A protein has these predicted regions:
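Glycine-rich loop at the start of a catalytic domain that most often binds anionic cofactors/ligands
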Residues: 61-66
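Extended two-metal-dependent nuclease catalytic cores across DNA- and RNA-processing enzymes
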Residues: 14-19, 69-167
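A broadly tuned preference for mixed-charge, low-complexity surface segments
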Residues: 46-57, 96-106
Length: 167
């Protein structure tokens, strides 16, 4: 959720940021919805779940106090859109998960390793590349070029594109 929403915001904020007639920012929600629809059509999943960071300190902050210390504050124009995206997911009847002390990528990792079958993870977060596993049928669908292009990475494609192995 977070990585796609951030990408949606920055991919659409270079020009006029979209707002409703009453002033609510919607550019990231609009782009997120478009990407979600594209992903759902591409994969046609039996189940779908979106993972969010809660924005609070996690166990990693306890281990390394300066974890993510250099990050800029999230723009207020984007902060306001997180609730709208959650509302949209509820309207789509798509489950979303967020937990104190656990980041979204950890939630994704837990779910990917818990379930069997073809698992497609939509994210631009390269940290998730480590989850790619051809034997477990786990692949990453990465957003490229803003929000318009989706590349699918399995073990072969990961090595061909980045000279990396997931484990």
């Amino acid at each position: 959720g977070n990585s796609v929403l951030f990408r949606a915001f920055y991919a659409t904020s270079f020009s006029n940021i979209m707002k409703t007639s009453f002033g609510a920012y919607t550019n990231a929600v609009y782009a997120f919805a478009n990407m979600l629809n594209k992903a759902l059509k591409m994969v046609e999943p039996d189940y779908c779940c979106v993972a969010f960071d809660k924005g609070k300190a996690t166990f990693r902050h306890q281990m390394t106090p300066d974890y993510k210390a250099g990050r800029k504050e999230t723009p207020v124009e984007l902060v306001e859109q997180f609730g709208l995206v959650r509302d949209m997911l509820n309207a789509y009847n798509i489950k979303y998960l967020e937990y104190d002390e656990i980041e979204a990528d950890d939630i994704i990792g837990i779910l990917a390793n818990k379930f069997e079958g073809d698992i497609s993870i939509f994210s631009s977060d390269h940290d998730l590349f480590q989850l790619i596993d051809d034997t477990k049928h786990i692949k990453i669908c990465c957003m490229k070029k803003g929000m318009s292009d989706i590349g699918v990475l399995d073990e072969h494609a990961l090595y061909a594109e980045y000279s990396l192995k997931p484990y």
